[in-house]
Amino acid sequence: MLMLFGGSFNPPHIGHRIIAEIAYDEFNPDRFLIVPSKNPPHKSIDFIANFDKRYSWCERVFFEHYFEVSDIENKLPSPSYTIRTIEYLSNFDKNINLLIGEDSLKNFHKWYKWEEILKKVKLVVYPRYFEEKNSYSVDFDYVKLESPIVEISSTYIRQRIKKGKTVKGLIDDKIFEEVLKEYS
């Protein structure tokens, strides 16, 4: 089984790391892919560090042998639609789990070709907010990852840096100085 954990990782932070570790421990996938988006369709390109930088950060944050940081979305057409990544990966592995946050689940029905995604993967959802399943506009079949709610976001980190506030402990030391420089 392949676990796919995609995102802008703008920047990758301790919350991403915690979620990935728990998902790996819980599901023990054959492969665990960390996939930074090249050009996420729902994000403004003005606020995103370039792909090579985010890819490099992910390589240093997710350094264990059981994580594999993939540049696949850098090779696929833009924008970086999840379905394109899944279709490419399904050439090699038909058993794909897609790891997403509960906040993404709420708007999943707005994703490009979301119904096709559901036919090709099993959704694994990590908790982000205290919301009931029935608050989603579409009923999805998914597995909920048993993990603590990690309320750290890349947006929060970027905002703190812009205000000159500390983000110590929220970002891996291996990328700390680069992240500060990028978003200051």
Swiss-Prot record:
Coiled coil: none annotated. It catalyses: nicotinate beta-D-ribonucleotide + ATP + H(+) = deamido-NAD(+) + diphosphate. One of its GO terms (biological process) is NAD biosynthetic process. Its EC number is 2.7.7.18. Pathway: Cofactor biosynthesis; NAD(+) biosynthesis; deamido-NAD(+) from nicotinate D-ribonucleotide: step 1/1. Keywords: ATP-binding, NAD, Nucleotide-binding, Nucleotidyltransferase, Pyridine nucleotide biosynthesis, Transferase. It holds the Pfam family CTP_transf_like. One of its GO terms (molecular function) is ATP binding. Catalyzes the reversible adenylation of nicotinate mononucleotide (NaMN) to nicotinic acid adenine dinucleotide (NaAD). Belongs to the NadD family. PANTHER family: NICOTINATE-NUCLEOTIDE ADENYLYLTRANSFERASE-RELATED, PHOSPHOPANTETHEINE ADENYLYLTRANSFERASE. This is Probable nicotinate-nucleotide adenylyltransferase. It comes from Petrotoga mobilis (strain DSM 10674 / SJ95).
